């Protein structure tokens, strides 16, 4: 408590704009981390982007913005590890009006509580421009990791990208040799990308999948790892998963949706290779194989695999993520399982657990605040977002209910 009081006094001694950026959440119910006990009637103070104090009956310095809470539910900031800044609203992100970009971020991402997102294929020029403006404080948005352009099989652009403008489509890498794959990864990196995305299995038509040759996939993975970048793969089917496993991919960007041959032995091999998986079950909810896809996700989890939350938002133009929570519950995952997917698991995957993925003193001031507790009743309560706070800045605030 003495340390907290020192920090509070330090907050109180500040003046001007710095105080205006400090935030307090009072009388909250807090889930500090996936396995930690619930804390009730708790106050959290954020200063300079970090959690400066946590406790009961803490005095709140004057000048600090206090968010109305009344028993609201507080978590570490949610991650969405599969999004795409792919719509026309992201064109010319370097010069689009800041208030419009903030509204677009809210519409697609922050209204669902996401304080960190991973973009798994978009035009890197636009996405890095958006990220730059978010980081400067000009635009209210989440922390953004980006893959830039995904790498496709030779002559392997998926059919669902047929409507892309010809100029953009011509820029999509389809490396035909290992050297070309290395060059494509390097070109992305030169534009400021953070991760690598491979389409190890790509749908040329709804019933025809083509694949990246293994030597090309291995070259891309090796180049990504040489720069300490995680490598994600869109697998599609058994062969796409097999290439991802054998090339050293870190994360499956989807559960496989053409499920033939994907058996328990392969799932256990993925876990043994320390691969993670993003289920994206809403994407497949209309599939005739959805029951089996959910089974694969649960098998992976039960075998000890790390699941990450992601929705393919941006490719999916319906930005409501409620169905993803419903599908995860139907798959047999618990509240604590899904909370890990949203917080501690992605923080661990991105090697930032020392300061992200939990609510703790000195940690990042990234919080997602809900109006209803998903531990009680329905996992869809994860979508009932009151506030999203990123580094102490409120980047989403739900409109008042009358």
Over which residues does each language-model region extend?
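Histidine/acidic-residue-rich, glycine-tolerant segments that coordinate divalent metal ions
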Residues: 136-243, 258-261
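Alpha-helical scaffold segments that flank or form the walls of functional sites
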Residues: 92-140, 172-194
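Active-site core of metal-dependent hydrolases
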Residues: 198-199, 203-294, 303, 308, ...
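Divalent metal-dependent hydrolysis catalytic cores, especially in the metallo-beta-lactamase
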Residues: 104-128, 141-149, 193-203, 230, ...
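C-terminal cap of metal-dependent C-N hydrolases
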Residues: 348, 361-402
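Histidine-rich, glycine-flanked metal-binding segment
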Residues: 34-75
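His/Asp/Glu-enriched, well-ordered alpha-helical/loop segment
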Residues: 292-374
């Amino acid at each position: 408590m003495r340390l907290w009081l020192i920090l509070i006094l330090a907050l109180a001694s500040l003046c001007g704009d710095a105080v205006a950026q400090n935030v307090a959440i009072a009388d909250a119910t807090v889930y500090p981390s996936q396995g930690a006990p619930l804390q009730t009637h708790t106050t959290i103070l954020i200063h300079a982007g970090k959690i400066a104090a946590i406790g009961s009956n803490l005095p709140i310095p004057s000048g600090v913005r206090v968010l109305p809470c009344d028993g609201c539910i507080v978590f570490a900031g949610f991650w969405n590890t599969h999004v795409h800044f792919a719509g026309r609203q992201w064109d010319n992100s370097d010069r689009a009006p800041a208030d419009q970009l903030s509204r677009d971020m809210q519409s697609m991402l922050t209204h669902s509580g996401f304080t960190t997102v991973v973009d798994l294929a978009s035009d890197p020029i636009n996405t890095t421009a958006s990220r730059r403006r978010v980081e400067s404080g000009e635009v209210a948005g989440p922390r953004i990791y980006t893959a830039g352009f995904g790498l496709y099989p030779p002559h392997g652009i998926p059919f669902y990208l047929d409507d892309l403008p010809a100029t953009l489509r011509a820029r999509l890498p389809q490396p035909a040799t290992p050297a070309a794959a290395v060059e494509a990864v390097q070109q992305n990196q030169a534009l400021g990308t953070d991760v690598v995305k491979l389409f190890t299995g790509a749908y040329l038509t709804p019933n025809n999948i083509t694949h990246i040759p293994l030597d090309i996939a291995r070259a891309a993975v090796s180049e990504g790892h040489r720069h300490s970048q995680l490598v994600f793969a869109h697998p599609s089917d058994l062969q796409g998963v097999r290439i991802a496993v054998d090339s050293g991919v870190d994360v499956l960007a989807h559960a496989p949706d053409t499920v033939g041959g994907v058996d328990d032995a392969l799932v256990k091999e993925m876990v043994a290779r320390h691969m993670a998986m993003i289920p994206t079950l809403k994407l497949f909810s209309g599939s005739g194989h959805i029951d089996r896809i959910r089974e694969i996700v649960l098998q992976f989890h039960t075998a000890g695999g790390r699941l990450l939350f992601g929705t393919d938002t941006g490719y999916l133009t319906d930005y409501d993520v409620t169905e993803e929570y419903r599908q995860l519950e139907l798959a047999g995952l618990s509240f604590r399982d899904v909370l890990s997917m949203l917080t501690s698991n992605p923080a661990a995957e991105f090697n930032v657990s020392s300061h992200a993925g939990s609510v703790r003193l000195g940690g990042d001031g990234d919080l997602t605040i809900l109006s209803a507790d998903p531990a009680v009743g329905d996992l869809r309560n994860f979508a009932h977002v009151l506030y999203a706070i990123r580094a102490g800045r409120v980047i989403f605030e739900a409109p008042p209910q009358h």
